């Protein structure tokens, strides 16, 4: 199936980044969120990113204009969803919220449309089961920032068809990404490796082994990481990190995935 028009649900950092990737890849893209101010902020962020590419000589002014013309933003979901080939959900990492969105997308999108989730940890099988088209539901997990990071995890739920998985995989390749096909396990691969490392860094801080700055220096200077695990935790959001750890802990029942008490305390404090 050829993908020509894409709907991205959620105009935050991830959603707007995904919309930018799709538009730069030649897709007509509709960016949707629940309030106009969120949509405007997302589109403004994309314009800023594109302007930087022009300044750096990585894109011509004409190319920027063409990409911008392929983008539009809306609040009303009904009209936006009626003629798309692919819908990508990129909202808060909460299963109830995602299920509600997929039920609505299922009722609004054309029968042929693929419904993809940018979830970083939640089960695609459970999300797909809320729809009448589970064979056309898959994971399409971009990493932050989406326009820069090459990796895309393409996740096959229990009912996801091979055709759906291959279509999304090929689309990611078309955008110049490095997609990988994965089975539906908690945290997939990226977050199953990365988030426990961040949790362990938090545990090291909790035990007073080193300061936050020193822990991040170890990761950057010793492992060659561009960003330390605690700085990365702040960028991702401690609440999101805690949620992912809870998904891993519940999904595997393994104590190595137990969230650090300090992480839980920080989230309770609103940090």
Predicted region positions:
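NAD(P)-dependent Rossmann-like dehydrogenase/reductase catalytic/cofactor-binding core
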Residues: 2, 166, 173-184, 203-207, ...
């Amino acid at each position: 199936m050829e993908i020509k028009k894409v709907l991205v649900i959620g105009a935050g950092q991830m959603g707007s980044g995904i919309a930018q990737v799709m538009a730069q890849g030649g897709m007509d893209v509709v960016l949707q969120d629940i309030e106009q101010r969120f949509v405007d902020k997302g589109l403004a962020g994309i314009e800023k990113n594109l302007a930087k590419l022009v300044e750096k000589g990585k894109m011509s002014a004409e190319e920027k204009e063409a990409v911008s013309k392929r983008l539009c933003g809306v609040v009303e979901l009904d009209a936006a969803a009626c003629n798309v080939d692919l819908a990508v959900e990129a909202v808060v990492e909460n299963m109830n919220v995602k299920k509600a969105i997929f039920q609505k997308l299922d009722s609004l999108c054309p029968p042929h449309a693929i419904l993809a989730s940018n979830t970083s940890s939640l089960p695609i099988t459970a999300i797909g089961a809320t729809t009448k088209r589970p064979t056309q539901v898959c994971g399409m997990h971009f990493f932050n920032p989406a326009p820069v990071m090459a990796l895309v995890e393409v996740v096959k739920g229990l009912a996801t068809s091979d055709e759906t998985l291959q279509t999304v995989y090929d689309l990611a390749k078309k955008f110049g990404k490095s997609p990988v096909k994965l089975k539906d396990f908690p945290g997939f691969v990226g977050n199953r490796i990365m988030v426990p490392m961040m949790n362990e860094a938090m545990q090291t801080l909790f035990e007073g082994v080193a300061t936050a700055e020193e822990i991040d220096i170890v990761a950057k200077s010793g492992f060659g990481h561009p960003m330390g695990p605690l700085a990365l935790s702040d960028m991702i959001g401690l609440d999101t990190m805690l949620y992912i750890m809870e998904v891993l802990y519940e999904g595997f029942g393994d104590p190595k995935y137990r969230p650090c008490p300090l992480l839980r305390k920080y989230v309770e404090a609103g940090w």
